[in-house]
């Protein structure tokens, strides 16, 4: 069984969700480096439509629920974001805000994410990951019942700060 109770097969690829504005960014480069040689699908939030959270729960058709379904099937999901003003990018923050829907109107889909493995991959200009982002991501995982397996950080497109965190994520993605 996969985390969260769903059937996991050898063909279930990991999932990386890219939340950077330009498609060819430092963060996109880091995603390619982290996932090199592993089965991993990519969702570029900048290339799809996801409406901002609405308390009324009324949305024009968008891709949010499709992405959540992919996350529920993946052995691990990597949230990849540049660090802007000590936090996620705007597109990543908007995506995470929509998880409130899973606690209001899409409860069964939200349940499928419990005990799933999530990791954060961040790129920024500082020597280390911003502590506020670390806390925000860990609390996000806790709030939906997911397991935060690692926080991976690199300065722009430089070396990863913590090779141990990289190894944890790659193992979860199927590296032997």
Cite the ranges covered by each PLM segment.
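Short, glycine-/small-residue-rich phosphate/pyrophosphate-handling segment
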Residues: 108, 112-151
